[in-house]
Amino acid sequence: MRLRNIPGAEAALREYPTFVDNPLFYKGNWKERFGNNNPIHVEIGCGKGRFINTLAERHPDINFIAVELKAEVVLRAVQRTEYKAIPNLAFVQYDASKLTELFADHEISRIYLNFSDPWPKTRHAKRRLTYKSFLNTYRQVLVADGELHMKTDNENLFEFSLNQFAAERFQMRNITFDLHQSKLAADNVMTEYEERFSSRGQRIYRVEASCVIK
């Protein structure tokens, strides 16, 4: 579903304390933004913001950053914060293909990919967030034992991703082809999209992958 254009969205974002207007300033120094040395977890694509907000509330000892390209999407997500300054949560409007401009080498402990665009046409494979070029970027910004957690409702994207992880020497675990019927469901935080589609009987696929520093 296409999100309608919201006039003035970029200006409106600056009214929210969780939005970071100058993210490049913090590259290598996100600890200054959060005021601590806690691990950093990044969600690429934030949807309506439920997932990242819930994690921030449950884990005050972890810093969370949502990276999203479209201002309208970020605005909808930050509105969940109701203008509150949540100390361990930040939203950034930026292109995820340029993560190395936002983060220094090995600055992130975990990356979340939730229901990313599957780009089903073969000629668009390079745009998939689990394509090898993206995985190499993740490896660069993740710590040595950093993790990538992926969820999708698209079986073809999931199988493609598993193959990419294997080819790029990511170590996989907790692979499930039906998340909500697995033991992993108990600790699962659902996105709005996930809740809607799983309620219709759609299976959710999930995997955790750890990078090996080359």
Swiss-Prot record:
One of its GO terms (cellular component) is tRNA methyltransferase complex. This is tRNA (guanine-N(7)-)-methyltransferase. InterPro entries: SAM-dependent_MTases_sf, tRNA_(Gua-N-7)_MeTrfase_Trmb, tRNA_methyltr_TrmB_bact. It comes from the Bacteria. The keyword Methyltransferase applies. The active site is at D117. Substrate binds at K121, D153, T191, E192, Y193, E194. Gene3D superfamilies: Vaccinia Virus protein VP39 (3.40.50.150). Belongs to the class I-like SAM-binding methyltransferase superfamily. TrmB family. One of its GO terms (molecular function) is tRNA (guanine(46)-N7)-methyltransferase activity. It is an enzyme of class 2 (transferase). Its EC number is 2.1.1.33. Catalyzes the formation of N(7)-methylguanine at position 46 (m7G46) in tRNA. S-adenosyl-L-methionine binds at E43, E68, D95, D117. It catalyses: guanosine(46) in tRNA + S-adenosyl-L-methionine = N(7)-methylguanosine(46) in tRNA + S-adenosyl-L-homocysteine. PANTHER family: 3-DEOXY-D-MANNO-OCTULOSONIC-ACID TRANSFERASE/TRNA GUANINE-N 7 - -METHYLTRANSFERASE, PENTACOTRIPEPTIDE-REPEAT REGION OF PRORP DOMAIN-CONTAINING PROTEIN. Pathway: tRNA modification; N(7)-methylguanine-tRNA biosynthesis. Keywords: Methyltransferase, S-adenosyl-L-methionine, Transferase, tRNA processing.
